[in-house]
């Protein structure tokens, strides 16, 4: 089924969680703001996960546990809880905004990496 409002900027891929039970994607909400949405691989209606006041600015990735999704929001690295949609920031604002390329979790989920100002950055996730 086609959904109006699907976005391809920032660069975007549909991503399935590690358990294979949810597919995440970026789509505009009723206010035109780019949000994370989830849908079952079996189909059904998509569920809006995030309710941010500003656009998600990057591609995203699933935490290895499937409990979090990482992305750039408000020029900061953020994670959204995969059930509640609650967003937590992992970084403060930097001089250069993070790249719109996907943030990447380490295999154990304890670290998150991203590009910013032509350099590789990492932070602990506490997850």
Residue ranges and their predicted role:
Residues 29-32, 76-77, 119-121:
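Short glycine/acidic-enriched loop and turn motifs that connect beta-strands
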Residues 110-127:
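Blade-level signature of beta-propeller repeat domains, shared across WD40, Kelch, NHL, RCC1
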Residues 29, 41-42, 72, 82-83, ...:
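A short, compositionally biased micro-patch
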Residues 1, 44-48, 85-89, 122:
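Predominantly a core beta-strand signature of beta-propeller blades
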Residues 37-39, 78, 121-123:
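Conserved hydrophobic/aromatic positions in well-ordered beta-strands
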Residues 4-26, 48-72, 95-115:
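Conserved beta-propeller blade repeats
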Residues 40-44, 81-85, 125-127:
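Short loop/turn segments that connect beta-strands within beta-propeller blades
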Residues 33-36, 57:
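Short secondary-structure junction motifs
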